[in-house]
Amino acid sequence: MAALPAGAKAPVFSLQSSDGKKLNLADALKKGPVVAAFFKVSCPTCQFTAPFLERLYESYGGEKFTLWGISQDDAADTREFCQEFEIEFPALIDDYGYPVSNQYGITNVPSVFFIAPEGKIQESSVGFSKKDLEKIAVATAKATGTPPVSFFKPGEVIPDLKPG
């Protein structure tokens, strides 16, 4: 099974964060859209993508928008990853066996989903795709009623695509 496409209903889930808080998708969607970014700490493409997701979180995170990293690693390794890459958005732990990753059809990481408040996947991206991440930024801006900001800074040399 491939990752769930745009238009699919997002499976509802509850996971524990790396700091021990229980978080669930249904509650998060009540306040606005959710970006769920699945990753592994050892994945070079995930390491490359994480700082761009942090930029999105810094630009839009708050009362109208949620961004979660969903780690396929244990809490200790996930906390270390977040510290190393200066990640402030919450990191949730998908327990051994990856039940949530499996529900979303994850075969490659990073896999990033923009989930609209009604629970449908509006945008999805597998690997690093500059175009897909820009679409997610635009969808986030529109959903939060704020001006769009770019993931990418002027002068940065960013590949269009980097497989996961």
Question: Which residues does each PLM region occupy?
Answer:
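Structural microenvironment flanking redox-active thiols in thiol-disulfide oxidoreductases
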Residues: 47-85, 99-100
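Short, internal strand/loop/helix patches
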Residues: 83-118
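Non-globular targeting/processing and membrane-anchoring segments
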Residues: 1-34, 79, 84, 105-108, ...
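Cofactor-binding loop segments of dinucleotide-utilizing enzymes, especially the Rossmann-like FAD-
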Residues: 40, 72, 117
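Short active-site neighborhood of thiol/selenol oxidoreductases, capturing the structured segment around
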Residues: 25-47, 53
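Short, glycine-anchored, charge-dense loop/turn motifs used at functional sites
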Residues: 20, 113-122, 126
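Nucleotide phosphate-binding site architecture
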Residues: 16, 44, 122
